[in-house]
Amino acid sequence: MTGEHTVRPIPIEPLVHVTDAIMKDPLDSCSVDLNRKELEKTLLNAMDHYQGIGLSANQIGIKERVFMMYSDIKKKETIICFDPFITKYGEETIIMDEGCLTWPGLWLKVERPEFFRCNYYDVDGELVQVEMHGLEARIFQHEYDHMEGTNFTKRVSPLKLNMAKRRAAKMRKKSLLSIEEK
């Protein structure tokens, strides 16, 4: 039939476990032969599927130094950052709640710089130099940590992390009990 097209769905890549080596090691620069447009689609598809506001390639098992994030959550505007690099941190810090797709249900109060300057390459390979503030800066730094082989659990004390893990376990148990009651 004319006018009809078959659209091949993009498969959803599974999230890797936080203990996977790909999440612990700093990532090298992006591969020269990387298909940036295809990776952009893959990241957006996975980020939307998992209902995240940011997603690094290594979270779905792709060993490339790249992440995608919402630059404006309300407008659903995204940016994709290849080979990101923070060039200067501001002195002011702010504490905000953070969660992570690879740590479901875990929320931590994390202190980070409120402002910074960074460089990254866009999907077309163009250098972007920007300043980020507020929530946009928070998301960028969180995803940047993944590129560096670390995560938000390393930014709080062991005591606070253990308390948050207990809270998350209690919430999961409560959630399971409420499902069983139905």
Please give the residue ranges for each predicted region.
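Positively charged
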Residues: 1-182
